[in-house]
């Protein structure tokens, strides 16, 4: 069966930065990897950012936002069916920063995907400099995107003091409690380390961290009303002589 890993995290947490490092490691270990990028916006910017890791051992498929939940599930299911037929042995899914993780689990339980795929690891990316106050919708997403993680990896840990990393972990606990979840993280399940210093042993541990069965109380809201997608394109400066 094809092992599928899920990289979750809120908008801007650093999922794509980590994914590039993680996929590069998997390819070096001899895996044939396909990345499934799911962006909230109409333009799949994240797919552009992973181009550097593409090659004989890695490819990418994309799903862009702008559709209702049922349509989105059909598109993801279709992509996963097509990917299973291409001979990959590892699929790494980077969902949007406001993704409903339960939706992904439901898709994997469908026939024929339940015969082709097995869930490997769920790795949640959380900003070590997480703001103290978030909207109710963002607090819910923080909980729902980490609740099944085998490991939480703090981003920007090199910029944070130990007290700030501890505050981010405490914030995560509060979000889980507010979402009426019994899931709590043991100290070894939260990794605060400069990503430039991540070793192959660290990445191997993340690849094998697995996932946890847990649930929380659902918060239903209009994602497009609560969050806005923006796309910034690089514009080359025009010299004064050409104006």
Residue ranges and their predicted role:
Residues 151, 159-240:
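C-terminal accessory "lid"/substrate-recognition subdomains
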Residues 2-8, 13, 17-135:
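Nucleotide-state-sensitive switch-loop elements of NTP-binding domains
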Residues 86, 90-193:
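Phosphate/Mg2+-binding loops and adjacent switch elements
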């Amino acid at each position: 069966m094809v092992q599928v890993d899920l990289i979750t995290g809120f908008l801007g947490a650093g999922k794509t930065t980590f994914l590039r490092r993680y996929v590069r490691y998997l390819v070096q270990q001899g895996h044939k990897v396909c990345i499934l990028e799911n962006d909230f916006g109409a333009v799949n910017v994240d797919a552009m950012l992973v181009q550097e890791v593409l090659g004989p051992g890695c490819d990418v498929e994309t799903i862009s936002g702008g559709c209702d939940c049922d349509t989105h599930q059909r598109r993801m299911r279709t992509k996963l069916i097509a990917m299973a037929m291409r001979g990959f042995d590892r699929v790494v899914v980077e969902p949007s920063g406001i993704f409903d993780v339960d939706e992904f689990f439901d898709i994997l339980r469908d026939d024929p995907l339940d015969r082709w795929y097995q869930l490997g690891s769920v790795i949640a990316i959380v900003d070590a400099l997480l703001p103290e106050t978030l909207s109710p919708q963002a607090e819910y997403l923080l909980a729902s995107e980490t609740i099944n993680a085998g490991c939480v990896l703090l981003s920007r840990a090199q910029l944070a003091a130990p007290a700030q990393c501890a505050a981010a972990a405490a914030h995560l606990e509060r979000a889980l409690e507010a979402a009426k979840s019994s899931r709590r993280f043991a100290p070894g399940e939260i990794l605060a380390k400069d990503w430039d210093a991540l070793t192959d042993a660290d990445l191997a541990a993340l690849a094998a961290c697995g996932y946890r069965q847990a649930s929380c109380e659902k918060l239903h809201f209009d994602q497009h009303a609560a969050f806005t997608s923006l796309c910034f394109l690089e514009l080359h400066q025009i010299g004064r002589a050409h104006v």
